[in-house]
Each structure stands twice: as structure tokens, then as C-alpha cells.
Amino acid sequence: MPSGSSAALALAAAPAPLPQPPPPPPPPPPPLPPPSGGPELEGDGLLLRERLAALGLDDPSPAEPGAPALRAPAAAAQGQARRAAELSPEERAPPGRPGAPEAAELELEEDEEEGEEAELDGDLLEEEELEEAEEEDRSSLLLLSPPAATASQTQQIPGGSLGSVLLPAARFDAREAAAAAAAAGVLYGGDDAQGMMAAMLSHAYGPGGCGAAAAALNGEQAALLRRKSVNTTECVPVPSSEHVAEIVGRQGCKIKALRAKTNTYIKTPVRGEEPIFVVTGRKEDVAMAKREILSAAEHFSMIRASRNKNGPALGGLSCSPNLPGQTTVQVRVPYRVVGLVVGPKGATIKRIQQQTHTYIVTPSRDKEPVFEVTGMPENVDRAREEIEMHIAMRTGNYIELNEENDFHYNGTDVSFEGGTLGSAWLSSNPVPPSRARMISNYRNDSSSSLGSGSTDSYFGSNRLADFSPTSPFSTGNFWFGDTLPSVGSEDLAVDSPAFDSLPTSAQTIWTPFEPVNPLSGFGSDPSGNMKTQRRGSQPSTPRLSPTFPESIEHPLARRVRSDPPSTGNHVGLPIYIPAFSNGTNSYSSSNGGSTSSSPPESRRKHDCVICFENEVIAALVPCGHNLFCMECANKICEKRTPSCPVCQTAVTQAIQIHS
């Protein structure tokens, strides 16, 4: 018995390696012949059939995935019972041994136990095979091909349409990468019209040949992008830091526009570094940016060269003019009004240049506030007057030439000195029809608050000011010329910032006159005592020719008149001229070299420009000019067409100023 039991155990243990899973994908098992049709199985063949029956592999008919596991116990029991009935005791016994019923019973028991173990093993094997099949399906490389292509390893897409397939990185080895490269070759260069396409995930481009596949797919595109994205850097030097500031512009506006235009990055030099721009970008863009920078630098160099040529020479004297007949004068203004004269974006100074046909160089921030005006002498004088009048109108800073006049404080009166100025005043040349000028403005001292210039540029064309200190308009002295310009009502009605031309008539004014103040001779009294009539109309005893109109107004009074000129008497207005000094209402020093002195505090108190009695306490709305007392302001508003005497703007009301 022991020997029979050990033999039965050996037979049972012999087919133990059979339940191992087949390599994926598992080959279909060959169909087993039915028990009745085939020959009788003996020994190991019978046990193999029993094991296959236990696994449910003996049924060639298609079944559901879970059916073999469900029918495995019943099939195993039926097979064992049938075979036990068919086999004789001799067949169940091992060869060469006598029949042993106990061994047969032990063998049946062991077969039942092995059947149960096989059932469990079959379930586990089936689950493992399903999981492996799913993994194989997921990790396999899918090649999309037209329906005509038949391959056992390809998956057909209905209709031959190409779709996007996402593959995981698992099990994506070099062999599959090579297959993908081959598929790409078919797609981009094959004879098939529809082609094949391999789809791979980006994270699958890892080790195992995937990098080579990606390079094969995108090699040409990457090379093209590299050729297009090659950048170059070039340094563009400019002459000076001033050129850098000009090219960069205010708050970098110009350099930003250049960057956008050329599609480059331009690094600007900082203060203290060499004036070199560093341009980075494509080669053609860098070349265009370099041309733009060098062109702007050359343009600025030309402008600066012209400024240096026309600018002031050493010693503060005027430079020689560019062309024959041209001259350059300097107009000094306070620091605080430089921007006012220049205007927003240079609009004011450009307008003055266009109106006067001159070239005006504005002062830089680190230099004296002196405007350099170049042009013909008469145009230069017009431009100077425009600048002065613009400051006067915008700031309201006037100086009254009354008994405490400018010459009394600044020393010698230039109009009574010998030399060029005196000869100009005493010349017998006729007065040309020209713009009005103030002779007191032109002092040849470097400390002049109105600038300095050459004397011949002022009087080279025999031009005389018509409201100079000795003009009949000053109402305090007499005229030294042979002729007097005739002023009519049509001339007074013109409202212009620059004083209009006055027609000339041959009317002599050497008639008897009564000077208010005695004259002690030319040059003997350095300070001519100029008296200005404070109130009332023309003096009772005329100091001018009787043919001169009684209704004459001062030319500057045209800016502050309120009524049209008529034949009646008008209120005599004193001479008001702007003060261009820093903090003091004084004029420049005279030719004698004496320094300017500040007027007393009483000079700083402004009186009404209409009545000259009351203090200025009213302003007109909407223009805002505060040059009137409340009584005169109300009179202006009560007129039929109320308008500001200064700017001729329509007035709606007058308001009182509390200061």
C-alpha cells in the first residue's frame, strides 16, 4: 500500500506544471477529441484531460467570459464519475502491480482535492490573463491604417479615418519607437495616399529610443526655428550723453517707439557710463535700429552745431550773424518764466518764430535763462517784444513809469548820453513806419535783466521808439525828430500783441511848448525828471503839435482800452511795461555800469489801470484779469457789450479779491 500510494502521489504530482499561464497572448489550445469518438486515454493522457476539463478548456463552443469558471466543478465531477465507472481495477492500478481498491479510492480523493485547487487556480489565472491582455492593449503601439490594410498586430479604425490616440509611457521600448518612426515615414513619404500615423504621449518620449523618434518627427521644424531665432547683439556708440538724452526722449518715449518699430531690445547707457547703446535682436532688425540711432545722433549733432555757431561768444557778447544783415540778440527772462515762454511742447516759442520770421534758441536747464533770437534786425525786435509781451500778459507783472521812474533808480539815462545812442536820438532821419519799441529795454550791460546786444543792431536802420522816455506819448517831454507819425482811429482799433506799424506823415512838431519840468541841457542832468500825469485828460497846455489828435492813446494802452477811440477826451494811461527781474520790479542797469536797485515798497502796490486811484481788488470773470478796482470793474460789466480791456474777452461778472 505505501508503494501504491506513493506511485499515485507521483502520478498526481507529475502534471503539476501544466496550470502555469501561457505567454501573452496565449495561443488557443487545440480541441480535445470527445471521449466516445477517440481512443481510450491511459495514464498521463487521462490526467491531462481531467486537468483541462477542470479548467473548462474541453468545450470548443464559444462561451461567456465567466462560463468556464461556473461550469468547472460540474464538469470535473461528471468526468471523474464517468471515468471511475468505465475503468477496471486493473486499469486503475499501476502497471506491474496487483489491483488495489484502496489506492483507487485514495486516487479519487486526491483527484477531488486537486479539482478544487484547479478551480481556484483557474479563477486566478483567468483574472491575471484578462489584466495582462488589457495592459497589452493599452501599452501596444496603435498604428492607424486604411481598412484595406490587414495586419494581425494593428487595430482597425472604422471608415479609415485618422484619429488621435493617446498612449501611456509604460512598455514603450525602442522597438515600438522604431515602429513609430517607420509609421512617420509612411505618413510623410510613403506611397500610400492615406498613410499611417503613430500617436505618442509627450511624457512617453523618455528613455528607450523615444527621443530619437521625437527628433525624427520634428527635426526639420526645429532646425527652421533655430535659423529664425538666431539673435545678434551690436553696440552703437553716440558722441555724448546729450545725444543719449535726445535719442531716449522724455521718459523714454523715443527709445520705446524705436524698440517697437524695430522689434529689438535696446539697452540705454546710464549716467556715468560710456554713451553706447546695446541692441539685441535679429540681424536685420539690429541693422535697422542701428541706422535709426545713428541718424538721430547725426541730426542732433547738426542742431547743436548750429546752436554753437549762433550762440553767445565768450564774454556774453552777441555773435556775428549767419547771413549778411542778420543779427543775434539775447533776451534774458527770469528762470520761472522760461517754461512759460517755451509753452507746451514748444508751441509758444514756435509761434513767435513763425510770426516774426526769426530763429530762437531756448536756454538749457543748466545755463542762464537767455533766449537767443537770430534774424533781421526788425524781426529780432519784433520777436523780443513778443516774448516780453507774452510774459507780461501771462504774469500780469507791470511797472508804472511815473515820477519814480526806472531811470531815476538805474542811474544815467541812456537817451541823453553821448555816443551812438545819443547820436541816434539826435539824428534828423525821419522816423520809419515800424513797430513800437522801448528804448529803456536795450541796455548794453551784462547785468541787464532784459539781456544785452550790440547797439548797431538796434539802431542800425535808424529806427526810433515811439514810446521812449522822450516820446510825446510819455507826456513828460518833447520829441527830438523831424517828423511825427500820425496816429488815426483805425490804428488804435487794431488789437495785436505786437504793436502795428504807424503811417508816417510830414508833420513837424517844432512848435511852442511848455515843458512841465525845466530841462537843464543834454547830458548835464543824468536823470531826466520824467513826470507822468496821474489823472485826467490831456494837459491844458499842449506840449505837442496842435495837429496831433487829442484822443491819442498810448500804443500799449490799446491792450487795456475799454471803449472804441472817439474824438472826446480819454483818460490818460501811464506807460506800463513788463518787469523782467528776479523778485524786484526794477529794470536793467544803464550804460554807465551802475547796478540795478530795488524800488521802494510803495512801487509794489498796484493801482487800478482805469482810474489810477483805487487799489486793485477786483477781477473779471471768466478771463481772470485782476487789474481793476471794484468800481471800474462794475462799470465794465454794466456796458452794453462788456469785455475785458486787456484780452477783449466777453465779461460776465466782476468778483472781489480778498488778500
Curated annotation (Swiss-Prot):
Keyword Repeat listed: yes
Start-end of Acidic residues biased regions: 104-137
Zn-finger (RING-type) residues: 608-648
PROSITE patterns named in the record: KH_TYPE_1, ZF_RING_2
EC numbers for this chain: 2.3.2.27
Stretches with biased composition (Low complexity): 1-15, 64-82
Transport among keywords: no
Biased composition (Basic and acidic residues): 83-94, 551-562
Biased composition (Pro residues): 16-37
Subcellular location, record wording: Cytoplasm; Nucleus
Annotated positions of the Phosphoserine modification: 88, 537, 545
InterPro entries to which the protein is assigned, alphabetical: KH-I_MEX3_rpt1, KH-I_MEX3_rpt2, KH_dom, KH_dom_type_1, KH_dom_type_1_sf, MEX3, Znf_RING, Znf_RING/FYVE/PHD
Compositionally biased spans, kind Polar residues: 526-544
Listed GO MF terms: RNA binding; ubiquitin protein ligase activity; zinc ion binding
Domain KH stretches: 232-293, 326-387
A Pfam family assignment: zf-C3HC4_3
Subunit structure: Interacts with USP7, which antagonizes the ability to degrade mRNA.
Disease linkage: Genetic variations in MEX3C may be associated with susceptibility to essential hypertension.
Function summary: E3 ubiquitin ligase responsible for the post-transcriptional regulation of common HLA-A allotypes. Binds to the 3' UTR of HLA-A2 mRNA, and regulates its levels by promoting mRNA decay. RNA binding is sufficient to prevent translation, but ubiquitin ligase activity is required for mRNA degradation.
UniProt protein name: RNA-binding E3 ubiquitin-protein ligase MEX3C
Organism this protein belongs to: Homo sapiens (Human)
Gene name for this UniProt entry: MEX3C
